[in-house]
Amino acid sequence: MQLQKIVIAPDSFKESMNAQQVGNTIKKAFTNIYGNTINYDIIPMADGGEGTTDALMHATGATKYTVIVNDPLMRPIEASYARADEHQIAIIEMAAASGLDLLKKEERNPLYTSSYGTGELIKDALDHGAKTIILGIGGSATNDGGTGMLSALGVQFTDANGKLLHMHGDNLAHIAQIDTTNLDTRLKEVTFKVACDVNNPLLGEHGATYIYGPQKGADMKMIQKLDFAMSHYHDKIKICTGKSVNQVPGSGAAGGMGAALLAFFDTTLTKGIDIVFDITNFHQRIKDADLVITGEGRMDYQTIFGKTPVGVALAAKQYHIPVIAICGSLGENYQHVYDFGIDSAYSIISSPSTLEDVLQNSEQNLLNTATDIARILKLQ
């Protein structure tokens, strides 16, 4: 196979290698066989999940910063986010400040968790000149409709007696007025690009509370209470902003965080991989490639539902470029990916092994597999 340019666009291999390491290892394998005759372009990828911040940091030249914010139960914690100050870009993961994994199982109760810490991260980004904020909203512990985040940015929520409310899920039902007088004015110049891979509306049986409440600690009684409270909150949003966001796909994401971002800010909700495509200038970089190599830790039937390898493959097929996937393992029904642009898929596991051995030897196994593939291609 005549190869002049190869684009290597993998996701991370969970718990063993980040996407950059995967890309470097594949390049090393091909260089061992082809020498320096090929132009390589390594583009670390992610689909909005783990590794997204790293992929975007690589693309923008961003640096990670750590600040003190409040966790979902309003306790001080350290949380990190990334900034590329020269590009006025910030990359924030909601889970860093308001994530479910920050709470013990017995602490998880969406009646009392708040997204305030996410607002504090946004405020710190504003303090350093951010004009574009890329926000990943997966893995949240909250069902407060983004009111905690809004509070941290200056919005005031008051009850029927004019008393200021400290916002969490339970207090949504007590909102009488939303006052945006003190909302940080810098937000008028900010664009939010939100990595959101769910289409749930804000309310109802397919909405934020019913679908995601249980994993955040809500029982059925709590779910009914929270959904009613969320409906009341949405009525107040309409009065305050003139916008009805309930039926916008993704408004229910992250316990209603999507609704708050859509209602109050210049926001687009986009699939995580599409944000990575945009920031990395992916389409421009692949269109003259002779081969695209992608991969992920485990490829199976779920891969066809928006995961990185299929996203990369579908993009490559727009330019009629062949696509090879190299993965940590190939799971049940992985062959479905062949209907979505991937021409051939390989596992790096060559013999029965323990999980510990697989993770420990993943780099060498990847090098071996990629070398074998390079040898086959050179025969053609």
Sequence positions of predicted segments:
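N-terminal loops that bind phosphate or other acidic moieties
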Residues: 2-137, 141-380
